[in-house]
Amino acid sequence: MALWGGRFSQQADQRFKQFNDSLRFDYRLAQQDIFGSVAWSKALVTVGVLSQDEQAQLEQALYELSEEVTANPHSILQSDAEDIHSWVESKLIAKVGDLGKKLHTGRSRNDQVATDLKLWCKEEVAHLRQAIIELQKALVVTAEQNQHAVMPGYTHLQRAQPVTFAHWCLAYKEMLARDESRLADALTRLDVSPLGSGALAGTAYDIDREQLAQWLGFASATNNSLDSVSDRDHVLELLSAAAIGMVHLSRFAEDLIFFNSGEAGFIELSDKVTSGSSLMPQKKNPDALELIRGKCGRVQGALTAMMMTLKGLPLAYNKDMQEDKEGLFDAVDTWSDCLHMATLVLDGLQVRRPRCEEAAKQGYANATELADYLVAKGVPFRQAHHIVGEVVVSAIEQGKALEELALSELQKFSSKITVEVYEILSLQSCLDKRLAKGGVSQQQVSYAITEAKKQLNMDE
């Protein structure tokens, strides 16, 4: 039975009912709805609507219902209830009779669903933060194992300067740290309870909403009932964090797809996260990474859709807000799945160090070192830059690396160049000179790994 039938003389058209009902997706809020109902029953005792015995009966029945949901959550979908609130109430009435009809006193589905969704978001934020931390740990472990794996760094997808695979791993660890901090920051605004705001004007019962918020595990109660039932900023913030996080994972995937390609050959992915071709028996495809990259778009789409849903809504609640859940659920599930899959990809990944080093020596990635060498000899940088550009052109024409050019050839471009230049042009020298904080030198990378392990409590 619908919760609102008294006003109507005709039954809803079945087509409208199917269009209107939300149980097919908001069943995921069952535990939150039950938890909120337990807290609300306690609040009703404080204003004399329920006796202590009645509240105890309701709480016991709600906990029994919670256990049933835990055992078989999909059984909810067998019901023709309009939404999860209707389902919980009908099940409660079936257990305790007319007493169950008293629970909704002073409460609206508007503040109820807002509370349920915030509780769900809080739980998911905790899960996502942990998944991010686990991926960060995997990156740090991979970095520690590959501190000496020299590879080319890229700009414009052109070889630029030598870096290490460890330095690459730590770059993504930093991105993930920002993702985790965004979730932590969003939690400060999410952690307020709307329950007790009624449909829009507040509840008519003198309920202590701050106490109610504490029972629910929120830091405090909201300040304005109109805002409470119509606020979905927390959905936007979580979707925004997910969208940014998925961009980072997509870039991570794209890098590894390239590193794994036959053209680069820097890494070998585990068989556990790759698949083959139905036609070409030699293929080993990076499907896990390609799916991470591909799933990024659906999360961006969920954020855009929610923005568009909310942009024209007047205060307070509107049925449009029912559209907040499907995109959110899918985006959070997708982000979580991709975080776990990225962690799995790193487990078993092998770095082909000889091939990485060979590639790092190509493409004149040490040209900047020659320019810096000339600067140290007193040549202004802009002039040194021009000189080295000419040296590179000459080397390309001869099919040689810079360090393969004879000293006499180098001195044609600048008399400042002497024999020690060959030591400067070595890969190790290129790395060792990057001693400033955040640089790619062994000293800085080792320090960064140590600090990351402290931050992530990896030494405990």
Curated annotation (Swiss-Prot):
Coiled coil stretches, renumbered: none
Catalysed transformations (reactions): 2-(N(omega)-L-arginino)succinate = fumarate + L-arginine
An example molecular function term from Gene Ontology annotations: argininosuccinate lyase activity
A matching Pfam family: ASL_C2
Top-level taxon of the source organism: Bacteria
Pathway terms, separated by semicolons: Amino-acid biosynthesis; L-arginine biosynthesis; L-arginine from L-ornithine and carbamoyl phosphate: step 3/3
Listed InterPro entries: Arg_succ_lyase_C, Argininosuccinate_lyase, Fumarase/histidase_N, Fumarate_lyase_CS, Fumarate_lyase_fam, Fumarate_lyase_N, L-Aspartase-like
UniProt xrefs under CDD domains: Argininosuccinate_lyase
Enzyme class: lyase
EC number: 4.3.2.1
Record has Nuclease as a keyword: no
Biological-process GO terms, alphabetical: arginine biosynthetic process via ornithine; L-arginine biosynthetic process
Predominant place of localization: cytoplasm
GO cellular component terms attached to this protein's record: cytosol
Gene3D superfamilies: Fumarase/aspartase (C-terminal domain), Fumarase/aspartase (Central domain), Fumarase/aspartase (N-terminal domain)
Keyword list, A-Z: Amino-acid biosynthesis, Arginine biosynthesis, Cytoplasm, Lyase
Cell compartments where the protein resides: Cytoplasm
PANTHER family membership: ARGININOSUCCINATE LYASE
Family of this protein: Belongs to the lyase 1 family. Argininosuccinate lyase subfamily.
Name assigned to this protein: Argininosuccinate lyase
Organism in which the protein naturally occurs: Proteus mirabilis (strain HI4320)
